[in-house]
């Protein structure tokens, strides 16, 4: 059965928009994906008819809202094949999840003189928290570099690992290059020296089937808005025993067991000890609807369609003169490029006139820009609703810019 692209596009109301008098070609889903009507309606329905503060409420609405929220926690656990619902922490997004691990696990278990490993292709969210930890704790940050083809030079990882390595933090798919990293192998190597592992799944969650038990990672993080859900909601997966050993990062309501001015405070078990304050319940409902949508469409079907579309796009882009592509030959979800000597901002501005939305800049990956010796790149990204016709429009737009501006 062929992929139902027209039906899928009809599920996303914003895709019917026009920009600058042109039909919108939205090629910026790696930054944030559009939302299907089912997600929009689920969040609105919750606020219209179901909303109440969760936890500890004895009235019916509160109990129902709490049950609905915990049902989504169970849904997330099943979606990534976590061993227990208690391994799922709701956060604002990937950035908060990584900061939580850095500030809770990192400041407790990583000592002066220890080291941790990141890679040259990480998003700033998986660099800066570790740099901050290193500065505060006297920890060394080691960097796994890129190979010449734009993939990670994983052959160098064993040489970076030693008995003082406490953590490996790596993206599963680069938000710039689209490289799919061999994280399962890297995790096994890190565990051999006793290090814990964190996988940034912000990009992979919308393109790959994720099985955290198969990966055997200690932490896995992602954002809802990348997988067609609302903004402001994300997930930290952590192995239960590890989460239970970690102290809370933030204090407040909901994360306590007992508070006393005389004897101090004791904390709830995980995951609730990491969920201080009122949660984004509407966002959680929307996240559940987004996972329902992806599951109904079929993750294997999505992967097949997007793989075919990526091959088509890479072949079509060969028609553009003076186009430089960045990254390995096999990539997932994103295509990074520059056109001649033109600044990415100028290329993106011209494409916007034609109704084509791409992302330009350093993509929160300045070390990667430094590696390639450029200040910025253009990035087109694919999603479940992207069409070959939109790829053709991108190619035609780039050809037109080249004719107008030269190389």
From Swiss-Prot:
Name under which the protein is recorded: Cysteine desulfurase
UniProt cross-references to PANTHER family, sorted A to Z: CYSTEINE DESULFURASE
GO cellular component: cytoplasm
Main location: cytoplasm
Superkingdom of source: Bacteria
UniProt KW keywords: Cytoplasm, Lyase, Pyridoxal phosphate, Transferase
Membership in a protein family: Belongs to the class-V pyridoxal-phosphate-dependent aminotransferase family. Csd subfamily.
Reactions catalysed, as given in the entry: (sulfur carrier)-H + L-cysteine = (sulfur carrier)-SH + L-alanine; L-selenocysteine + AH2 = hydrogenselenide + L-alanine + A + H(+)
Active-site residues from the entry: 364
Gene behind the chain: sufS
Pfam families per the UniProt record, alphabetical: Aminotran_5
CDD domains: SufS_like
Cofactor: pyridoxal 5'-phosphate
Coiled-coil boundaries: none
Role description: Cysteine desulfurases mobilize the sulfur from L-cysteine to yield L-alanine, an essential step in sulfur metabolism for biosynthesis of a variety of sulfur-containing biomolecules. Component of the suf operon, which is activated and required under specific conditions such as oxidative stress and iron limitation. Acts as a potent selenocysteine lyase in vitro, that mobilizes selenium from L-selenocysteine. Selenocysteine lyase activity is however unsure in vivo.
Naturally occurring in which organism (per UniProt): Pectobacterium carotovorum subsp. carotovorum (strain PC1)
Signal peptide span: none
Enzyme Commission no: 2.8.1.7, 4.4.1.16
The protein's assembly and partners: Homodimer. Interacts with SufE and the SufBCD complex composed of SufB, SufC and SufD. The interaction with SufE is required to mediate the direct transfer of the sulfur atom from the S-sulfanylcysteine.
GO biological process, one term: cysteine metabolic process
Metabolic or biological pathway, per its Swiss-Prot or TrEMBL entry: Cofactor biosynthesis; iron-sulfur cluster biosynthesis
GO molecular function: cysteine desulfurase activity; pyridoxal phosphate binding; selenocysteine lyase activity
């Amino acid at each position: 059965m062929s992929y139902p692209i027209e039906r899928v596009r009809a599920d996303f109301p914003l895709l019917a928009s026009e920009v600058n008098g042109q039909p919108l070609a939205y090629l910026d889903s790696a930054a944030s994906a559009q939302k299907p009507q089912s997600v929009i309606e689920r969040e609105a329905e919750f606020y219209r008819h179901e909303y109440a503060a969760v936890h500890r409420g004895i009235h019916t609405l509160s109990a129902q809202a709490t049950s609905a929220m915990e049902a989504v926690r169970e849904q997330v656990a099943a979606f990534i094949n976590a061993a227990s619902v208690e391994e799922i922490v709701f956060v604002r997004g990937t950035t908060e999840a990584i900061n939580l691990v850095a500030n809770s696990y990192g400041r407790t278990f990583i000592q002066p003189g220890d080291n941790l490993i990141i890679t040259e292709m990480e998003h700033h969210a998986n660099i800066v928290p570790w740099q901050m930890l290193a500065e505060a704790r006297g920890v060394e940050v080691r960097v796994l570099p890129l190979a010449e083809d734009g993939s990670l030079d994983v052959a160098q990882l064993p040489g970076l690992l030693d008995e003082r390595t406490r953590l490996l933090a790596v993206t599963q798919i680069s938000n710039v290059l689209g490289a799919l990293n061999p994280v399962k192998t890297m995790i096994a190597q890190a565990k051999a020296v006793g290090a814990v592992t964190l996988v940034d799944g912000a990009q992979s969650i919308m393109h790959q089937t994720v099985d955290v038990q198969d990966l055997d990672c200690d932490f896995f993080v992602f954002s809802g808005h990348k997988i067609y859900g609302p903004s402001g909601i994300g997930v930290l997966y952590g192995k239960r025993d590890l989460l239970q050993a970690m102290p809370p990062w933030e204090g407040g309501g909901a994360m306590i067991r007992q508070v006393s001015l005389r004897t101090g405070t004791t904390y709830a078990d995980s995951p609730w000890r990491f969920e201080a304050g009122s949660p984004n319940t509407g966002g959680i409902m929307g996240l559940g609807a987004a996972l329902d949508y992806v599951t109904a469409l079929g993750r294997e079907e999505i992967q097949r369609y997007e793989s075919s579309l990526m091959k088509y796009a890479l072949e079509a882009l060969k028609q553009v003169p003076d186009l430089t592509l960045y990254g390995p030959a096999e990539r997932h979800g994103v295509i990074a490029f520059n056109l001649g000597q033109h600044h990415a901002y100028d290329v993106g501005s011209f494409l916007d006139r034609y109704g084509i939305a791409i992302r330009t800049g350093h993509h929160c990956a300045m070390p990667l820009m430094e590696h390639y010796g450029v200040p910025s790149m253009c990035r087109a990204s694919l999603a479940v609703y992207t069409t070959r016709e939109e790829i053709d429009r991108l190619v035609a737009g780039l050809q037109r810019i080249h004719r107008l501006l030269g190389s």
